[in-house]
Amino acid sequence: MEGDGDKLQSAVIVPRHIALVMDGNGRWAKIRGKERCEGHAAGVDALRVALRAAAGCGVEYLTAYTFSTENWNRPEEEVRALMGLFVTAIMNEMLDLMTNNIRLLAIGDFSRLPEDVRESLEKGIRETAGNTGLTLVLALSYSSRWEMTDVIRRLARKVRDGSVEPEDINVDLVSDHLSTAGIPDPDLFIRTGGEKRISNFLMWQMAYTELFFTDTLWPDFDADCLKAAIEEYSSRERRFGKTSEQIALRENKY
């Protein structure tokens, strides 16, 4: 992995957390006369490249939208193939994750996942728990609407049980009940494949995230593409509701 981040200029501000929608696997396969499952397999290879590049650039967290709750509505054959691919990919990538000191986490409604997928995830999370490099978060059977509904349900139970007062519910308490509790909000969102929407992904967490869209299909997204996105992110002014003058004044203090 050495050298993956060498081409970034020293002045570039690297996002701590990147959220990623890996779109375009099916179209990539169709253009080449291949089956959709072959496009998804190529997408796994692209994620491996992106992981190494992100770690080389100094990114601490990368959350990949791997399978949404809406994806359960895809043809049964494709869903079955994707589930098998998840198991194979996790098993095959374990050595690479360990070698590159990458920690694996996952978020989503795991109750809908097949048992072998859950077992593979649990094994990967357990075996990489001690790694201290980049954290890869797989969003599997995930959507923001599912997540917020789950948060509301759990907080409602706590109010009913008397452990939480309605007046105690604030932004911090909601954040503490999210699937991503303990993980910083994304600084940069990247979506490949040409679509310009976030597709029910980390909607609470991305309140102030910088959005980057590219026409590049996911299997073609390489290290140079990632670095270009980071450099674009670095050129933007993140104000978080403040004015440019307030940001400049704050920066001048340091």
UniProtKB/Swiss-Prot annotation:
The keyword tRNA-binding does not apply. InterPro entries: UPP_synth-like, UPP_synth-like_CS, UPP_synth-like_sf. Mg(2+) binds at D23, E210. Its EC number is 2.5.1.-. GO terms for biological process: polyprenol biosynthetic process. The active site is at D23, N71. GO terms for molecular function: ditrans,polycis-polyprenyl diphosphate synthase [(2E,6E)-farnesyl diphosphate specific] activity; magnesium ion binding. HAMAP family: ISPT. Belongs to the UPP synthase family. This is Isoprenyl transferase. It comes from Porphyromonas gingivalis (strain ATCC BAA-308 / W83). The gene is uppS.
